[in-house]
């Protein structure tokens, strides 16, 4: 049986989730790019109570994803501009450094908690610390997790029943499942 994630590492992912949600909420309020969050989920994010946002931050998986395996669009963030770009850059750098550190500590936990691929972890483990600031300037480096499951974001932002939250967690941790299957199964749980 694989080792259970360290609570310290899980707490760290929860902190990163809080920062990511705060960035997304600010971006949604100002009608800026929400890093791939579906428009319906943007509205739900703005309407979510602080308690629900905290519950979402406690999700046992990163709510963001690093796109190290994907081709970059070429758009870069200018951290010296401050404001939005500065906040986006800081968030990206923090997540990137955390992913690098986690992938060096435990590939199992990096895959489980952050959804990092083997290729991404190899790249991060071999990357000098001095390369991180330049990589963090790529605007599409950090995006919302579960991009193909917009319905999952809606449910995560609305559902507070423990049994439904548990099922959402299981769905999110099994990205290889048929994408429509979980939606049908989740609908059976709804009142």
Predicted regions and their residues:
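N-terminal interaction modules that seed assembly of large macromolecular complexes
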Residues: 23-66
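Aromatic/pi-system hotspot detector in well-structured domains
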Residues: 20, 52, 56, 92, ...
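Extended, low-complexity, amphipathic alpha-helical coiled-coil/linker regions that act as scaffolds
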Residues: 2-10, 120-127, 131-159
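Intrinsically disordered, low-complexity acidic/Q/S/K-rich activation/interaction tracts characteristic
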Residues: 1-29
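Amphipathic alpha-helical packing elements
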Residues: 30-46, 88, 92, 97-140
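Long, compositionally biased
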Residues: 56-81, 138-177
């Amino acid at each position: 049986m694989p080792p259970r994630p360290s609570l310290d590492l899980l707490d760290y992912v929860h902190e990163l989730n809080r920062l990511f949600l705060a960035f997304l909420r600010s971006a949604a309020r100002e009608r800026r790019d929400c890093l791939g969050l579906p428009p319906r989920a943007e509205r739900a994010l703005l309407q979510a109570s602080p308690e629900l946002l905290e519950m979402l931050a406690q999700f046992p998986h990163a709510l963001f994803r690093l796109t190290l395996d994907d081709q970059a669009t070429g758009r870069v963030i200018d951290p010296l501009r401050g404001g939005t770009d500065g906040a986006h850059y800081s968030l990206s750098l923090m997540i990137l450094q955390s992913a690098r550190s986690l992938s060096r500590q435990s590939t199992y936990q990096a895959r489980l908690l952050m959804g990092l691929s083997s290729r991404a972890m190899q790249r991060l483990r071999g990357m000098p610390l001095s390369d991180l600031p330049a990589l963090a300037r790529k605007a599409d480096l950090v995006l919302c997790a579960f991009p193909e499951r917009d319905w999952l974001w809606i449910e995560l932002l609305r559902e507070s029943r423990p049994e439904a939250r548990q099922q959402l967690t299981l769905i999110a941790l099994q990205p290889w499942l048929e994408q429509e299957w979980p939606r049908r199964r989740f609908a059976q749980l709804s009142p």
